[in-house]
Amino acid sequence: AVELGKVMGARVIAAASTDEKLDFVKQYHPDATINYGDGELKEKVKALTNDRGADVIYDPVGGDLFDQSCRCINWNGRLLVIGFTSGRIPEYKANLALLKGSSMVGVFLGRFRKEEPEAYEQNLNELLEMYAAGKLNPIVTQSFPKEEYVKAFNIFTQRQAKGKVTLEFKSE
């Protein structure tokens, strides 16, 4: 997400729950980093954005982080819901949407592919072109044989993932 944001010209603030994860993400060159493990995400985002808040928030975690993210979004900002690796599906407070003129957008690639196949294909082609041009360099940090899918999935549910975690499907 950091790398894609940078390629698209955004000022990117990367946030993570540990300094170890932030050290990892720095190789993607975010403009700033925030450790939200202390529960002060809003204050830190506001300090980095001249008290405005973030225009777009990418949230793959959900749970308590989602609750904090809703409070540090800028006027007319968008909160992109990618997943719920925290294990808790949060609720979006309508009063925050009203007060901030913000919106929440669910990003579900599987459904997007089904409902808008042409747009999906166009987006995929753009990503592949960026990759071929060397603008996107995903880092695979762990790879598992397909039989160990539960182990790979647990990396996410235990919030231990850094970089890309993949499954190997070998033809026989």
What are these regions (language model features)?
Residues 1-38:
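Mid-domain Rossmann-like dinucleotide-binding core that forms the NAD(H)/NADP(H) cofactor-binding site
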Residues 25, 64-135, 168-172:
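Glycine-rich phosphate-binding loop and adjacent beta-alpha segment
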Residues 30, 53-54, 97, 136, ...:
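Local beta-strand N-terminus motif with an aromatic residue
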Residues 34, 57-58:
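N-terminal Rossmann-like NAD(P) cofactor-binding module of classical short-chain dehydrogenase/reductase
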Residues 40-51:
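Short amphipathic alpha-helix with an adjacent loop that forms part of the alpha/beta core around
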Residues 50, 74, 160:
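Short conserved AdoMet
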Residues 133-142, 150-172:
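C-terminal capping/lid region of NAD(P)-dependent oxidoreductase domains
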Residues 145:
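A conserved short coil-to-beta-strand element within the FAD-binding core of flavoproteins
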